[in-house]
Design a protein with these regions (language model features):
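Amphipathic alpha-helical segments of tetratricopeptide repeats
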Residues: 89-97, 129-137, 169-179, 209-220, ...
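A short, Lys/Arg-rich alpha-helix, primarily the initiator
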Residues: 1-13
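Alpha-solenoid helical repeat architecture
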Residues: 100-105, 139-146, 179-186, 219-226, ...
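Single-residue signature of alpha-solenoid repeat helices
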Residues: 85, 125, 164, 204, ...
Length: 429
């Protein structure tokens, strides 16, 4: 970092105005020119400024600090062992070599955005982004690229998918040529999943293939599986059903070879969703039952979502034995974990719990409770998530319930809403 930039960096860091730092030394206008690199300060002025800022006169070479950050960055690129990542974070947290030079300190701050996102501290990530906004001018090209990419990560996690995609595409434009292939792959994959969330299927397909090519070359199995799953989803939306199933089967095959529970979980889950959408309920049940073997006990929302799909399959098959089995299993999960309306802490949890309540009321023919839960709890969540397939499903059930109760006008309205949701689903896919 150049002399003027160093002075400005520490002035901003210490929240000093130009006039505060310049006081008794030189004019604020002269200090501004020094910071901009337009004039070189005399040795006496430079020494006085550095003493006032309490920084060394010259930048410090810090190879050990740089190595600590490189290790941290590598762990964060494809995080698998979050315990090791946390251990490394706590190891370097108070390390004196992270704050003795500006380059390492800035790099560390940027990597903290990624760390907070990975560990689920989204508020911490947001605060770090806000803090770093005023230091963007001091970033080198790679740091500037990573800052925008990690801002994209944060926006993706808070479900601001439009902004996430825009940030990722900007990061692609400003990425330095020295970026490693795996880093490029991670960016392409991030673009793909953001585009998929926005149903920009051609973009999602393009970048999934670009990421897959890199991950196959570099052999990153976890991401190979995830790319095939994303391609399976986008190909289904593009009406290429055979290609969609082929990608999902490849993902499942690789997952079985690697025997990694998380990969098997997402592969089996997406295969089940595919077959459910195509009304092959036996195959859907088979894959979802397999999926349950790989969901950790603490992933309550995921288990509840799996039970919901199994219940819906049994409803469609009119398999009342299976229906009773999965309703009982789901209800035991709710009771054992003391889940109630105040429990959901995020949209995924909310959707799973509200859906299970609706299915339970439907199963027990408690139509008043079903109507209340569907209209007040589940449908608003589905609308927020733009889950048109399930909106059509539950509007349809509401229509049938109103028909049974002789509420013909309400029935017609709900069945019309179901048709509208189905149209939106088909136009999105």
């Amino acid at each position: 970092m150049e002399t003027g930039a160093r002075i400005k960096y520490h002035r901003i860091k210490q929240q000093l105005e130009l006039s505060d730092l310049a006081a008794d030394l030189l004019l604020p206008a002269e200090l501004k020119k020094i910071e901009l690199g337009e004039i070189t300060p005399s040795p006496e002025v430079l020494k006085a400024l550095c003493e006032k800022l309490k920084i060394p006169l010259n930048p410090i070479e810090n190879p050990i600090g740089q190595e600590l950050i490189e290790q941290f960055k590598e762990m964060l690129l494809h995080p698998q062992e979050r315990i090791r990542i946390r251990e490394h974070y706590y190891f370097i947290l108070q390390h004196p070599l992270l704050n003795i030079d500006e380059e390492v300190e800035l790099e560390y701050s940027i990597q903290l955005i990624r760390f907070f996102v990975i560990t689920g501290d989204l508020d911490g990530a947001g605060e770090k982004i806000q803090e770093l906004e005023k230091f963007k001018e001091f970033m080198n090209q790679e740091q500037y690229y990573l800052f925008h990419k990690y801002c994209g990560n944060h926006n993706y996690m808070i479900k601001n998918f439009d902004e996430a995609l825009n940030l990722y595409l900007l990061a692609e434009k400003i990425a330095p040529s020295s970026v490693l292939p795996t880093e490029c792959g991670d960016l392409y994959y991030s673009i793909a999943i953001s585009a998929a969330q926005l149903h920009k299927n051609e973009v999602a397909d393009k970048y999934s293939r670009m990421a897959l090519a890199i991950y196959e070359e570099e052999f990153v199995p976890k991401r190979i599986v995830e790319c095939h799953i994303n391609l399976g989803i986008t190909q289904q939306r593009l009406k290429n059903f055979k290609a969609s199933l082929d990608h999902l089967k490849i993902a499942l095959k690789i997952g079985k070879k690697l025997n990694i529970n998380n990969l098997l979980y997402i592969s089996e889950f997406n295969c089940s969703i595919f077959y459910y959408a195509h009304r092959d309920f036996n195959s859907s049940i088979h894959h979802m039952e397999n999926c349950l073997n790989y969901i950790p006990d603490e992933y309550i929302a995921d288990k509840l979502a799996a039970y919901c799909l199994l219940v819906k399959c049994c409803f469609e098959k009119q398999d009342y034995i299976g229906l009773q089995k999965w309703m009982k299993t789901g209800n035991n999960l709710v009771i054992d974990n003391n889940i109630d309306l105040n429990s959901p802490t995020n949209q995924k949890f909310s959707e799973a719990y509200y859906e299970f309540r609706c299915l339970q009321n439907l199963y027990e023919e408690n139509y008043t409770a079903f109507e209340k839960d569907a209209l007040k709890s589940l449908i608003p969540v589905l609308e927020t998530d733009k889950n048109f397939h399930d909106l059509a499903y539950y509007y349809g059930h509401l229509g049938n319930v109103y028909l049974k109760l002789g509420k013909f006008k309400k029935s017609a309205i709900m069945l019309s809403e179901a048709q509208e949701a189905l149209k939106k689903f088909n136009s999105f896919h």
